[in-house]
From Swiss-Prot:
This is tRNA pseudouridine synthase B. The gene is truB. InterPro entries: PsdUridine_synth_cat_dom_sf (IPR020103), PsdUridine_synth_N (IPR002501), PUA-like_sf (IPR015947), PUA_sf (IPR036974), tRNA_psdUridine_synth_TruB (IPR014780), tRNA_sdUridine_synth_fam1_C (IPR015240), TruB_C (IPR032819). Belongs to the pseudouridine synthase TruB family. Type 1 subfamily. It comes from Pseudomonas fluorescens (strain Pf0-1). Keywords: Isomerase, tRNA processing.
Length: 305
């Protein structure tokens, strides 16, 4: 007997998941996608299985804007285990070296300023970056080590929240592409004792914070009671991650031409940059970019939500 193909729903929006410990970002995405029975889904950048916290999941039309969330600044809290280094720079790796921890809180406070502002990082081998089409973590598992180019990242905030014996809890606000494992490892080397990430929790992704998230258990409970459609109540609008962008509202005529790919003028447009656009009814219809001639060129358009 032929298997009946499941008909997925055309739903759009963003669910802010508090990613559970032990899940890959994709596994978490596929679980929530199943709960929604959503046709199209994508996440906004991977969190390691060891990490928990803010993971924006995009569905339907919202997937068109996931790159802009991927490029946004992030916030983390991490627990650094001092005195050891591991193969992966976190608790999942094998211990490479152990050294005595002779530093105190004042020593840690003294080195942190060196890692604030614009710094250079060498990405870890255990990362999703690719070399000749192969993820670095696969090469690392095969015992290979390849040269990685340093990358410039910005640490806007680096604060010691607590220090106890051989652990330090840190708060980090950083630019996209920052590896917290590398940051902790580099701090450990500066202290002379080594360190790895024992815990990692993302507290912010772009405009989104932990206070806005929902747990997988909460989603499952709602689904058990009301099915796929009951989970829809957790969907945020597709432009939720773009709330700090300038907002323009087009007339009915301008919206018509713009949705058909034509740049249009808007009296309140900024002189440059990206903008969110609503139609005359206040419905989000996409994002545009201000051209040199002042017109708004369409960049990503959405269907009616």
């Amino acid at each position: 007997m032929a298997q009946v193909k499941r008909i997925r729903r055309n739903v759009s929006g963003i669910i802010l998941l508090d990613k559970p410990l032990g899940f890959t970002s994709n596994a978490a995405l596929q679980k929530v996608r199943w709960l929604l029975n959503a046709e199209k889904a994508g996440h906004t950048g991977s969190l390691d299985p060891l990490a928990t916290g803010v993971l924006p999941l995009c569905f339907g039309e919202a997937t068109k804007f996931s790159q802009y969330l991927l490029d946004s600044d992030k916030g983390y809290e991490t627990l650094a285990q001092l005195g050891k280094t591991t193969t992966t720079a976190d608790a999942e790796g094998e211990v490479l070296q152990e050294r005595p921890v002779t530093v105190g809180q004042a020593d840690i406070e003294a080195v942190l300023p060196k890692f604030r502002g614009q710094i250079s990082q060498i990405p870890p081998m255990y990362s999703a970056l690719k070399r000749d089409g192969q993820p670095l973590y696969k090469l690392a598992r095969a015992g290979e080590v390849v040269e990685r180019e340093p990358r410039s990242v910005t640490i806007a905030r680096l604060e010691l929240l607590a220090f106890e014996g051989d652990t330090a809890r840190l708060a980090v606000d950083c630019s996209k592409g920052t590896y917290i494992r590398t940051l902790v490892e580099d701090i450990g080397e500066q202290l002379g004792c080594g360190a790895y990430v024992a815990e990692l929790r993302r507290t912010q992704a772009g405009p989104f914070t932990l206070a806005q998230t929902v747990t997988l258990e909460e989603l499952e409970a709602v689904h058990a009671e009301g099915g796929n459609e009951a989970v829809d109540r957790f969907l945020m609008p597709s432009d939720s991650g773009l709330q700090d962008w300038p907002l323009l509202q087009f007339s009915e005529a301008s919206a018509f031409y713009w949705l058909n790919g034509q740049p249009v003028r808007a009296p309140d447009a900024p002189k440059f940059g990206m903008v969110r656009v609503q139609d005359h009814n206040g419905r989000f219809i996409g994002i545009g970019e201000v051209s040199e001639d002042g017109r708004i060129a369409p960049r990503r358009l959405i269907r009616s939500e």
